[in-house]
């Protein structure tokens, strides 16, 4: 999934001296940096969750037509953005690291009133058990406690995508 900020900010997304959280671990799952080494498990999670992903990220056709090669390119992009501190993609894995359960994206936003936007998804097979709601709750708490943001948007979670898209830009 390619999550792009609408426009680069003249200020860094996070302060230069901010220590980026390595991840989050609960009794159920672990978040850690998404890397190219996750491609096989990530690809399987994405393609088996395609219908759900089109609901989580409306208005597009992703991940229709995604190949493992394209997923590898996407993961490399996310990994490089993480290293450059311009956005942060975390894979959500089981504690044994045997399965990818979803992803969390912490991104800059150009929306006035917000200094970050967080997007997340859980694999379709885990929805009935409530994983996505538990993941969202844990991530919101983690962001509030560990990250330097004052105001975070969660499009599609407490704020409709349509509402988020209509927010004025910081540039206007």
Regions found by a protein language model. Name each.
Residues 2-126, 137-138, 142-172:
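GNAT-family acyltransferases
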Residues 131:
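ATP-dependent phospho-/nucleotidyl transfer catalytic cores
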